[in-house]
C-alpha cells in the first residue's frame, strides 16, 4: 500500500477536476513525513476552474521555486499552497516571515497572486509539541500581502483580482518571453 499526501481539485459546481500528490516530502524534524508518505507521481498541474486557472502545491512544495515556475509555465493564473507549518524546534526564531517571503517571491517572480492557507492550533505527541502559526495570506502579483489571517483564530480572507490585467502585466514584463531554459 502506498500513501500520498494529496489534494482533490473540485470546481465551484462540484465537478472533480483532478488530484495532485505532494511532490516534495520533508524528511527532517519535526516534519518526518517520509515515514508516512511516498513522494507524489502526478507532477505539477494546473486546472481551469470557473474563476481562474489554478496551480496547487502542498506545504513543503512551496519552498521550491521550480514548482511555482512550472505551474506558471503551464498557464496557472493563481497559485495555491495549503500548508501546515508552525514552531520549528530546530530554529531559534519565528519562521513565519521567511515562510511568507518565500511565497511572496513566487508571486512577484511569476507575476501572479499566491494564496497560502495554514492551520492553527497545537499538536502534542509525547514530549514533542508544535504550535501552528496560522497567518494564512493572499499576495498579489507583485508579492504584496493584500489579506492576512491572524495566528490563533479560524478565519476567512478574500481578495479580488483582475486576471486579464495581471496577464497583460505579465506579458509586458517579458519575464517568460526572455527566459533561457537552455542555459539552466
Predicted regions and their residues:
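CN hydrolase (nitrilase-like) catalytic-core segments centered on the catalytic cysteine
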Residues: 59-157
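Active-site catalytic loop in hydrolytic enzyme cores
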Residues: 1-78, 82-105, 172-173
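A conserved C-terminal secondary-structure "cap"
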Residues: 166-184
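Acidic, His/Gly-rich catalytic cores of divalent-metal-dependent hydrolytic chemistry
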Residues: 161-164
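Conserved hydrophobic/aromatic beta-strand scaffold that supports enzyme active sites
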Residues: 6-9, 19, 44-46, 116, ...
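Short helix-loop capping/hinge motifs at secondary-structure junctions, enriched
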Residues: 15-17, 144-146, 167
Amino acid at each position: 500500500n502506498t500513501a500520498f499526501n494529496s489534494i482533490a481539485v473540485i470546481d465551484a459546481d462540484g465537478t472533480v477536476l483532478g488530484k495532485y500528490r505532494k511532490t516534495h516530502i520533508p524528511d527532517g524534524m519535526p516534519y518526518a513525513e517520509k515515514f508516512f508518505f511516498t513522494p507524489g507521481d502526478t507532477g505539477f498541474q494546473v486546472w481551469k476552474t470557473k474563476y481562474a486557472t489554478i496551480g496547487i502545491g502542498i506545504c513543503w512544495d512551496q519552498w521550491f521555486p521550480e514548482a511555482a515556475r512550472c505551474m506558471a509555465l503551464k498557464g496557472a493564473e493563481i497559485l495555491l499552497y495549503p500548508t501546515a507549518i508552525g514552531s520549528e524546534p530546530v530554529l531559534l526564531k519565528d519562521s513565519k516571515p521567511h515562510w511568507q517571503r518565500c511565497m511572496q517571491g513566487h508571486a512577484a517572480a511569476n507575476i501572479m497572486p499566491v494564496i497560502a492557507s495554514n492551520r492553527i492550533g497545537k499538536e502534542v505527541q509525547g514530549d514533542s509539541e508544535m504550535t501552528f502559526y496560522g497567518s494564512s495570506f493572499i499576495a498579489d502579483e507583485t508579492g504584496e500581502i493584500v489579506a492576512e489571517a491572524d495566528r490563533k483564530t479560524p478565519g476567512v480572507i478574500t481578495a479580488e483580482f483582475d486576471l486579464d490585467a495581471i496577464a497583460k502585466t505579465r506579458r509586458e514584463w517579458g519575464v517568460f518571453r526572455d527566459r533561457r531554459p537552455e542555459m539552466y
